[in-house]
């Protein structure tokens, strides 16, 4: 009977876990890393971005997002939406074409891959014959025209990827009709561009890289007109009236040609080099659009004078007498223009530019062409991210004040709404307001609305104004000088350069109830700031704190501290600094804690920790934790708190320098060289903090490097001296496994401004295994974590239980240990692992609840260096669930992880993107959206210039997708039946392929089974 009862108990416990815990990666925030292709559907109003890693991401109205991932690890080079369809085609670097669709399922859409195709060409053909360089999605929605490196144009029927061989355009067909005296006749080179006649879909313009352009009639299979260009062709634009063509070239010129039907046209009607007469770079893309406000808009990328501005990334916009060269800080990938009106044929309204590090949208209808603020795809890495901090359940008053401060900073943006509005966001409104704060290398802190799917920028705080830096305050990088030519104008916010790396933010702590903020930096600076709704000119009071306490024999060899401005500084509305603590030596601040009820800030570095009273502006205590053997702590910024990229770069630079110096000195001692390189590579691996080899928990010697480094600080009102009186206290954990406790005497509120705060050492714990202490939590008499400062005062948490025994939970890298207070006797412990070398990298307290029960449970959430997430019960410290989350090789992702109060988390998957995940069944933020097919699809009459019946068994619904998921599934099923050889014509095609006539038909039809990408969706 016992066994049966135990089994029932286990089942009940498993069900309880299922009700509370569920791991999901929900959405990616930020800007896609290494974008490589851009597409836009005017009918769907959806934007598509392909990346070098093979991802494809679709964006519409805020909250409408889709993501897919190609199986092939190849860059996406082109993205094309089928006109008036819900399908799109991607071309990869490996020359494969992929068909994707948005399919409705359970009242939401998913992005699915439904087919793939690779041109095979005739037997024995060289690869260039089928290497695709240009793609045209025909307006019929039924054809793809594929131009290749060898000059051929293949016609393929979609969505089944059936090659229509009789409609292909060979390079020989084109060459035979070119005048014999044309200089480029013998070698047309690759097809650079394909464009459909806007007035006659049966005519296509083929542009070859040597300069020849051919107007081809698809019905009659012959050329209509030749345009004999002599400069290398970059792009072509067909005017809306169908009577003129613009071509841009590699010498920085563009030409206008007239479509007359008279063959050939040897000279352009107009030729111009906008930034001549000296040699210019290529104009890679050109667009001209009519405007009711006067002359047309002429927009082109590139064309800059090669010698003077060849390194600039520019798009020029010319309209009437206005001419601007929009200057970006990263390479331009592609651009397009959004137009107003029915069928998007009206006035140009916005220029959308994808550059390597951001997406910029320019308002073309407002004077000055201001930038429209993006609600998503914001570059998180405008300056490199150095730390993150999440705050849940922000009070409405604080939220509105931060919003108002941000509005003061956004006056330079256009007031026009976001122009990309495809799809419907069906996700419910967020249940709470959440903030994500990111610290950056340039000394800024950015506030993001992290409540929903879109990570929206709210406010930016800059700390650089407090200090004297190398930047010239009169240096205005945003505007060109009067009369400058070309007329440059800086656009975008990506700025990879920092005025002074010492400004970098390392730690952030925000009190959501009081509006106080503490930020700490790379050069030992800790700023205390208060939210102010008005601009204010004030001094920042600086206090220098000597963490070495006058110890002799130590000499700081690292960076100098930042110079504080001694004059009053004008601070805009928002968070304004009023107090500064400067640590000496000016090492990286490794830990901070803020208690806004007591008005205290704790701070720690590799040398010790201190306590600062920001109410009375004085330092209360200092504790030096430096071990006499910690000589490395005097060398400068610590490798463990550097960016991973910097650590890797510096480590391998040392390796290279070592090898170079050895060669220079002609050292022939191979054994010595091998030993040195092995040591340096070992140092590099140590700095990378890779997963260690399998080992058991073992005691560490006290002479391990940086044992005095302070890893965590914690304020608690608990029993430290005796069990009858609780007192305020400060706890500190170090890299050497030591925990220090200080009892604080905080005067009552009415005497707080006059009486001093005092601190006295009370306890010291030394863990036997000396593993770094990464977290400290005090549990009340009921085993619950103590509430945040001011949380009880605002009636947002119950008062802690002070009658039972309190416990201190010490989280080291290798184990969790519970001590009773005030005796500090060990009660229980949990080893993270004994064999596989797992170490705790991130720890936080989170509250979990089921979807049906309002009751919440507190747990410990842990991320290890193996990339695994663990949920641990409190106060019993038992392992509840664990999930793999991050690859253990992704050191920067693990180091960047931040937990939320309700079981969610964020970590960097690239310098510009956060992955959001959830461990909770109750709190999940993910896209839930629907895209309806365009109206044209529902009453579409085929306008394809080439019509070929599909084989029996392939229904027309597959060609003209109606948006009905059931119909789509039936269609897909019938396509698969067709692929499974139920059709006579298929067998004939196979017979041909066996004879060598065609090799791709079967392969491509067998691949039409729908396959989901990495779908981000919320079906419940």
Curated annotation (Swiss-Prot):
SUPFAM superfamilies: WD40 repeat-like (SSF50978). Signal peptide: none annotated. Disruption phenotype: In larvae, basal epidermal cells migrate to ectopic places and hyper-proliferate. GO terms for molecular function: GTPase activator activity; myosin II binding. Residues 946-965 have a biased composition (Basic and acidic residues). It is found in: Cytoplasm, Cytoskeleton. SMART domains: WD40. Its main location: cytoplasm. Residues 935-968 are annotated as: Disordered. Gene3D superfamilies: YVTN repeat-like/Quinoprotein amine dehydrogenase. GO terms for biological process: cell projection assembly; cortical actin cytoskeleton organization; cytoskeleton organization; epidermis development; establishment of spindle orientation; exocytosis; Golgi to plasma membrane transport; hemidesmosome assembly. Phosphorylated. GO terms for cellular component: cortical actin cytoskeleton; cytoplasm; plasma membrane. It holds the Pfam family WD40. WD repeats lie at residues 36-69, 76-117, 132-169, 193-227, 233-264, 282-324, 332-364, 386-462, 506-581, 590-651, 710-766, 775-827, 832-884, 898-921. Keywords: Cell cycle, Cytoplasm, Cytoskeleton, Exocytosis, Phosphoprotein, Repeat, WD repeat. Belongs to the WD repeat L(2)GL family. PANTHER family: LETHAL 2 GIANT LARVAE PROTEIN, LLGL SCRIBBLE CELL POLARITY COMPLEX COMPONENT 2. Essential for hemidesmosome formation and maintenance of the cytoskeleton elements as well as cellular morphology in the basal epidermis during development. Also involved in regulating growth of the basal epidermis. This is LLGL scribble cell polarity complex component 2. It comes from Danio rerio (Zebrafish).
């Amino acid at each position: 009977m016992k066994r049966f009862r135990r089994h029932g108990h286990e089942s009940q416990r498993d069900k309880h876990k299922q009700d509370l815990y569920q791991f999901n990666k929900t959405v990616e925030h930020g800007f896609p890393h290494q974008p490589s292709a851009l597409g836009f559907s005017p009918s769907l109003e959806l934007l598509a971005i392909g990346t070098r890693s093979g991802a494809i991401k679709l964006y519409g109205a805020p909250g409408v997002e889709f993501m897919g991932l190609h199986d092939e690890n190849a860059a996406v080079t082109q993205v094309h939406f089928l006109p008036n369809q819900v399908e799109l085609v991607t071309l990869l670097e490996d020359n494969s074409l992929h068909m994707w669709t948005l399919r409705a399922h359970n009242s939401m859409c998913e992005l699915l891959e439904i087919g793939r195709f690779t041109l095979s060409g005739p037997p024995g053909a060289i690869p260039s014959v089928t290497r695709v360089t240009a793609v045209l999605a025909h307006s019929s929605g039924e054809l793809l025209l594929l131009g290749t490196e060898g000059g051929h144009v293949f016609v393929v029927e979609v969505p089944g990827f059936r090659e229509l061989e009789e409609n292909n355009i060979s390079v020989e067909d084109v060459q035979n009709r070119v005048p014999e005296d044309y200089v480029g006749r013998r070698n047309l080179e690759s097809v650079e561009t394909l464009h459909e006649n806007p007035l006659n879909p049966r005519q296509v313009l083929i542009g070859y890289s040597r300069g020849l352009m051919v107007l081809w009639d698809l019905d009659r299979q012959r050329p209509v007109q030749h345009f004999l260009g002599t400069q290398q062709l970059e792009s072509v634009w067909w005017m809306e009236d169908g009577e003129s063509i613009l071509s841009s070239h590699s010498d920085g010129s563009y030409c206008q040609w007239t479509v007359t039907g008279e063959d050939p046209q040897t000279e352009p009607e107009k030729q111009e080099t906008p930034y001549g007469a000296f040699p210019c770079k290529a104009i890679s893309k050109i667009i001209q659009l009519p405007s009711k406000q006067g002359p047309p808009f002429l927009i082109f990328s590139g064309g800059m004078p090669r010698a003077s501005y060849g390194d600039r990334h520019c798009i020029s916009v010319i309209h009437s007498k206005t001419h601007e060269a929009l200057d970006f800080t990263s390479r331009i990938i592609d651009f397009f223009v959004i137009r107003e009106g029915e069928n998007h044929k009206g006035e140009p309204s916005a220029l959308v530019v994808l550059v390597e590090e951001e997406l910029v949208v320019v308002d073309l209808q407002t004077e000055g062409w201001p930038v429209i603020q993006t609600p998503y795809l914001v570059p998180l890495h405008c300056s490199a991210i150095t730390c993150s901090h999440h705050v849940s359940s922000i009070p409405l008053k604080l939220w509105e004040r931060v919003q108002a401060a941000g509005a003061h900073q956004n006056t330079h943006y256009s007031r026009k709404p976001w122009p990309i509005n495809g799809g419907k966001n069906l996700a419910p409104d967020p249940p709470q307001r959440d903030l994500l704060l990111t610290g950056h290398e340039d000394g800024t802190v950015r506030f993001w609305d992290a409540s929903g799917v879109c990570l929206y920028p709210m406010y930016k705080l800059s700390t650089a104004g407090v200090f004297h830096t190398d930047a010239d305050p009169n240096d205005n990088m945003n505007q060109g000088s009067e009369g400058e030519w070309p007329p440059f104008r800086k656009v975008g916010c990506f700025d990879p350069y920092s005025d002074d790396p010492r400004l970098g933010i390392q730690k952030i702590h925000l009190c959501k109830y009081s509006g106080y903020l503490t930020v700490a930096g790379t050069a030992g600076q800790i700023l205390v700031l208060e939210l102010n709704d008005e601009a204010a000119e004030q001094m920042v009071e600086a206090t220098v704190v000597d963490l070495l306490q006058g110890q002799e024999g130590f000499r700081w060899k690292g960076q100098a501290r930042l110079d504080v401005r001694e004059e009053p500084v004008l601070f805009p509305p928002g968070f304004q600094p009023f107090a500064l603590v400067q640590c000496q030596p000016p090492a990286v601040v490794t830990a901070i804690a803020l208690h806004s009820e007591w008005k205290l800030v704790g701070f720690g570095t590799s040398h010790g920790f201190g306590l600062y009273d920001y109410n009375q502006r004085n330092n209360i205590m200092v504790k030096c934790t430096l071990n006499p053997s910690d000589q490395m702590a005097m060398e400068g910024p610590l490798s463990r708190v550097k960016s991973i990229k910097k650590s890797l770069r510096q480590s391998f630079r040392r390796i290279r320098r070592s090898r170079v110096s050895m060669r220079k000195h002609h050292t022939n001692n191979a054994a010595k060289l091998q030993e040195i390189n092995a040591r340096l590579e070992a140092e590099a691996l140590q700095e990378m903090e890779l997963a260690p080899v399998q080992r058991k928990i073992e005691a560490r010697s006290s002479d391990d490097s940086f044992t005095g480094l302070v890893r965590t600080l914690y304020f608690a009102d608990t029993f430290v001296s005796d069990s009858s009186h609780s007192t305020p206290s400060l706890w500190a954990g170090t890299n050497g496994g030591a925990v220090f406790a200080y009892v604080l005497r905080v005067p009552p509120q009415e005497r707080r401004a006059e009486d001093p705060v005092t601190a006295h050492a009370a306890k010291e714990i030394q863990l036997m295994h000396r593993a770094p202490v990464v977290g400290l939590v005090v549990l009340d008499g009921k085993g619950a974590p103590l509430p945040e400062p001011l949380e009880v005062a605002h009636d947002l948490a119950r008062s802690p239980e002070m009658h039972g025994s309190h416990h201190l939970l010490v989280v080291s890298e290798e184990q969790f240990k519970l001590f009773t207070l005030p005796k500090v006797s060990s009660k229980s412990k949990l080893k993270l692992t004994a064999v596989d070398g797992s170490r705790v990298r991130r720890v936080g307290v989170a509250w979990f609840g089921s979807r049906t029960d309002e009751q919440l449970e507190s747990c410990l959430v842990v991320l290890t260096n193996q990339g695994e997430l663990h949920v641990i019960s409190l106060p019993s410290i038992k392992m509840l669930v664990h999930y793999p989350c991050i690859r253990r090789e992704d050191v920067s992702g693990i180091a960047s992880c931040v937990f939320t109060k309700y079981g969610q988390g964020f970590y960097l998957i690239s310098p510009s993107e956060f992955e959001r995940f959830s461990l909770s069944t109750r709190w999940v933020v993910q896209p839930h959206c629907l895209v309806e097919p365009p109206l044209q699809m529902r009453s579409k009459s085929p306008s394809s210039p080439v019509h070929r019946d599909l084989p029996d068994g392939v229904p027309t619904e597959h060609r003209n997708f109606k948006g009905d998921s059931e119909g789509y599934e039936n269609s897909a099923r019938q396509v698969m039946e067709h692929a499974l050889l139920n059709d006579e014509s298929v067998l004939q095609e196979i017979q041909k392929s066996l004879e060598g006539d065609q090799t791709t038909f079967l392969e491509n039809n067998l691949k039409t089974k729908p396959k989901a990408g990495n779908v981000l969706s919320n079906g419940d």
